Amino acid sequence: MKNIFKMISLFVLVLFSFFYTDKVMNLINKNDPLMNKIDLLKDKYEILPVNAILEDNTIIPGVKGKIVDLDKSYDNMKVSGIFREDYLIYNELLPSELLSNNMDKYIIKGNSSNNKISLLVLGDSNNIDKINKDNITIFLNHKDISINNIKKLSKNSIYTYGNNGIYSDEILSNDNTIINRISNNKSIYCLSKDKNSDTLTVCNKNNMYVVIPNIIGDYVDVKNNISNGSIILLNNINNLDIIIKYIKSKGYDIVSLEELLTE
């Protein structure tokens, strides 16, 4: 019985010692000029999240923000004792609605908080050499999805366009297996030119989002309608180089679809 009492007493003593030490260290840290400086400046580096825009069955994704982790930032700087901006450690601030919780909605655009846009083209075995350009997002027809074709498009993000825009479980299973194994991206997007409940159902079933471009057309359509966050699907690639040049001349950054829609 005495041994049990001694063990309990020792455990309580150790626990109290840890608690007391932690309290003392927290007090010391709070009085450290470095900690005070990080605490004083942390709001300067805070970036609030941009919330998603939901309307009916559509969504424009939000963008994550960030906030300084005071304790981790202090731990990262205390050896040198000097405040360094590049040593700050951040925690994410999530938008109020996430894409992962709204897979049953059509993505109609990227967030407009920056100058990024995505340029989509429909690829096939006949035009692969012409569309193999940096950051162009390519949707290949089911019949054109092959190891050889995907290897030729190593610069690009690649997704399946099903059978000319018609998706099925069998097509998605086959195409996604090849794309996920060979390409540099994960096949998580289906493409639709308008709202289609069948497309939404089968793609959601396969853990994929459905994207409806907000601009579909050619040079004139791009010129008249482009804005931050635009998802552009070209009807053909006849003026691809001219369109790319125009987009860049207006200060837009052409990025992959995945990057554009990253929260």
Show the residue positions of the predicted features.
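Ser/Thr/Pro/Gly-rich low-complexity linker/stalk segments immediately outside membranes or between
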Residues: V24-I38
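N-terminal hydrophobic targeting signals that begin at the initiator methionine
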Residues: M1-K2
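Catalytic domains of cell-wall/extracellular-matrix polysaccharide-remodeling enzymes
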Residues: I145-K155, Y159-E263
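Generic N-terminal initiation segments characterized by hydrophobic and/or small/turn-forming residues
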Residues: M7-L10, N31, I254-L257
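Non-catalytic propeptide/linker segments at domain boundaries
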Residues: L34-N114
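Hydrophobic membrane-insertion alpha-helices, especially the h-region
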Residues: K6-D22
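Active-site beta->alpha N-cap acidic-glycine motif
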Residues: M77-D169
